[in-house]
Structures are given as C-alpha cells and as structure tokens.
Amino acid sequence: MARSRLLNLEDQFTFYASYHTNKVNVLIHVFCVPTILFTALVLTHAIPGAAESLARFQLPLPLLGEVPVDVTVPLLYAVANAAYFVLLEPVAGLLYAPILLTFGHLSNVLYATHHDEAMKFAGIAFVASWIAQFVGHGKFEGRAPALLDSLLQSLVLAVFFVWLEVLFYLGYRPALFKRLQNRTGVAVAEYRREQAEKKRARGAKAE
C-alpha cells in the first residue's frame, strides 16, 4: 500500500498542492525549489567522498561535442530523482530529466573549477531560498510548509511538482490538471474544517 502511494501521482500532488494554493507562494516555490535542489547538489560535494568520481564517460551532445561526465554522488542523486519522476508521470518526468541531469553535472563542474566561490554562493542561495519559502507560507499561504508533515514531499517531490505547475500553466494535460484542482480543493476544505473545529474546541475549553 505504501509503495503504491509513493507512485501515485494524484495522491502525492494533491497533498503537495493543498499546501500551495496562494499564487504568490506558488511563484516563490517555482523559483526557489529548483534553486534549493541545485545548490544542495553543489553543497553535497563537501561530504567526504561525495565529490569523488566513481566513473567517467564521454557524452556526445549536439553543438557541444564530447562532454566528459563524472559519476559522483550528487549526479547519482539527480539520476535517481529523474527515474522516480518518470515513474510518477512519464512524459513530464522525461521532459524534466535533462534538467535534473544537467543540475547534477553542473554541480560537479562548479565544484571542480570554482570550489570556493561555488560553495559560498550555493550556501547563500540555499539559505535565502529556504527563507523565501517560509515567508511565502507564513505571509501569503497562512499554513506551515509540508516539510513539517512529509519529508518526502519537501526534499524530493517538491521540485517535480513545481515543474508540473509550470507545465499545467502552459496547458499540459488539462483534464489531469482539472482533476487535481478538484482533489486539492476538497483537501483544503477538509483542512479548513478541521482547523475551525479545533478553534471552536479551544474556545469552548477557555469558557
């Protein structure tokens, strides 16, 4: 059951989207979540052994020719994420896979060629992006981030779901988008009902 839920796009997206209904908060996440992922990949190189190349191969690319690629822990993490996202939603996952793999490769390149500057700016951008997201939730969404309820959502799936938000905005799979909107609306209404009941219960106890 747990495994099937992990691969159920509608269940996972509905949970995520119910925490992100405010347009300003959504926009903040569209920019900040990929930034957090990329900078985290850069910063991961500081873990002993993470920057070590486990293998190297030449990747032929149009216009760029043969590009040397080092297989490192950050790159493997990007590959694992890409594979998971393809299982969740094949087309959107395949469209996003090149971006994820580029993130992994560029994190290797930046760490190897601009070590001090890369770590400094990655650290600043990482912290600033998290702060921006907490502001988005506190000031605009009015609800604590999903980080407090689901680490999987916050640390793995968020980057794919902001990608889906962009695709839906561009007209991707409108029937799926409508279905997810309806499910999210139900989830948000249920959350607000529960919050109202808790508030009434607290008020009754105070009397």
Regions found by a protein language model. Give the residues of each.
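Juxtamembrane "helix exit" motif at the C-terminal ends of alpha-helical transmembrane segments
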Residues: 37-61, 100-112
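Core segments of transmembrane alpha-helices
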Residues: 32-40, 77, 96-104, 157-158
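Membrane-proximal soluble regions of multi-pass membrane proteins
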Residues: 1-14, 142-207
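Transmembrane alpha-helical segments that form the membrane-embedded catalytic/substrate-channel core
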Residues: 81-91, 105, 109, 125-142, ...
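Cytoplasmic-side transmembrane-helix entry/capping segments in multi-pass membrane proteins
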Residues: 93-102, 120, 150
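Structural signature of hydrophobic alpha-helical transmembrane segments
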Residues: 61-75, 119-124
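Short, amphipathic, aromatic/basic-enriched membrane-interface segments that mark the entry/exit
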Residues: 24-27, 61-70, 87-95
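Membrane interfacial helix-start motif at the N-side
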Residues: 13-43, 81-91
